[in-house]
């Protein structure tokens, strides 16, 4: 199962485990201009950047992340394999980015989990559970209920007699 240890992120404690052949060395939230920030509005562009250090050659690692709402509801959980990205072999430092062009999340606090697994998803190299908070603030939408703003339109036609 690997090592279990407490880690710190912005003064917050989180669960971390994994064997350590690859380590997550940093996670940043970036806006459309590439500036680091921790708050966004619904509809903004957001990039999640994960920096890593592979201490030895690792074939086809899988990079994953999951967003959780503050009440623990998981919003999504994509990974590089599901996206069809062939990472190949990694060694040394690197970064991988997950780009969201139109952030559909509604205003509240969210927590990000990030992980690096082997290609079979059976072995964690490094796993940071709900370690990185970010906030969606009001102003990007009038909607307030639910998880996301769906890209939809309304169409109304009165009934004529």
Placement of each model-derived feature along the sequence:
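Localized sequence-composition bias
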Residues: 1-161
């Amino acid at each position: 199962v690997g090592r279990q240890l407490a880690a710190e992120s912005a003064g917050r404690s989180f669960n971390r485990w994994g064997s350590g052949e690859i380590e997550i060395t940093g996670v940043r939230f970036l806006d459309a201009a590439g500036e680091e920030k921790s708050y966004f509005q619904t509809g903004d562009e957001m990039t999640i950047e994960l920096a890593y250090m592979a201490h030895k050659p690792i074939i086809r690692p899988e990079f994953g992340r999951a967003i959780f709402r503050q009440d623990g509801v998981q919003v999504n959980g994509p990974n590089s394999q599901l996206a069809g990205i062939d990472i190949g072999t990694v060694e040394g430092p690197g970064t991988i980015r997950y780009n969201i062009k139109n952030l559909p999340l509604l205003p509240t606090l969210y927590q990000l989990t990030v992980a690096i697994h082997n290609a079979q998803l059976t072995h964690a190299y490094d796993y940071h559970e709900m370690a990185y908070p970010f906030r969606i603030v009001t102003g990007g939408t009038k909607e307030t209920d639910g998880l996301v703003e769906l890209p939809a339109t309304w169409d109304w036609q009165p009934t004529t007699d």
